[in-house]
Amino acid sequence: MPTISKLMVALMATALVMSLAATAAADDSVAIEVRAIAASPDGDEFDSRLDDIEQRLERGFSDYSSFRQIDRHHKTIERDESAEFELPTGDVLVLSYNGRADDFVRLGLQLEDRFSTTLRATPGSTFFQAGLVYDESTLVLAITVE
């Protein structure tokens, strides 16, 4: 019987170590999706590729009635690293992954020399950054932390 007890303790210790290793590995990188959207007060076009965020766009950008996806990028960013996303305006968005804090992903967001901030987002959430002009529309960035 002592052998079974030792085996159980060894199995539990192995499971704990594997769980901690998986948690650490999950903390090493984050997947990000950036969608560039042209928003305009003219027309009523709504791009079906934006159906998953339609209500949030209409609520958050109620002055606009037309939303068209122009570009979409997926990148995985390693901890303490940055990734560049070229925008349709020619500007470059830089996102930095600064690790996790509790249930949040810590990100740095920089739009060349115009804007720089840090934020916390929950995995699976989408946040927006808007203000650049694109082809007589406002460029809205929908940034999803996957």
Question: Where are each of the predicted segments found?
Answer:
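Classical N-terminal targeting signals for secretion and organelle import
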Residues: 2, 19-20
